Amino acid sequence: ISAPVHILKADGGTLPLEAALQQPVEAVFTGPAASVLGIEALCAPEVNSISLDVGGTTTDIAFWENGLPLMARKGATVAGYPTAVRAFHMRSIGIGGDSRLHKTENSYVVGPEREGPAAAVGGSIATLSDALITAGYVHFGDEERAQAAIAALGGEPQAEARKIVAAAVEQIKTTIREMLDEWAKQPVYTVNDVIKGTEFIPQQLIGVGGGAPGLIRALGEAMALPVDIPAGAMVANAIGAAVARPTLSAGLR
């Protein structure tokens, strides 16, 4: 194949490879941006929504209002530092289907390390996917292997699995609360912002990615929100990369 190469940007646009080499910072958060574009192509949310792309290692979270993804008003933040790079208002956290499980005195911490394949599909140690299977949120692979891996952590398998899922859900809810607080503290730039305010009240969850069906269902129960997993959700990221288009900006003086 002889074709020009374009790199996805954090705002969902693309730029030529040559330009990306000159401005590599524009390529931050390209994976999460592809997921946002994929969701827009698959379902175009009509109500205020929180989307979550759940992979094996991370979960990418974005907000939607009036069918459009919210943009980070101060640009992308990397490791706590503002970059002024135009980007969606999103956050990536180290929780996914293959996340390692850390047992504490009374609960669990999920991630951020990736353990590897779930026991249900041939792995040797329990992961979040095994907990979701054992707790009945999703069904795939060898469910007996998943239950045995959870049992090896100690305690009754279903009870332990529910603890693990609850811990993952609480970690995600904490991140969502932080994102909501961050958005509410953003400066207002338009008359509409002054009139309506900047408070964002989610009305549904949208799940995409291989780990979405089980985890988003559990999160929806905890947040008392309906859940939408659109057709094609497993490949939303690839769809987003395919529909991306070039974007340009110009400064006027």
Annotate each PLM feature.
Residues S2-E18, G210-A222:
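Acidic-glycine-rich active-site phosphate/pyrophosphate-binding loop
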Residues G56-T57:
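Short acidic, Gly/Ser-rich segments with clustered Asp/Glu that frequently serve as metal-coordination loops
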Residues Q23-S51, D60-R253:
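Helical "lid/coupling" subdomains associated with nucleotide-phosphate turnover
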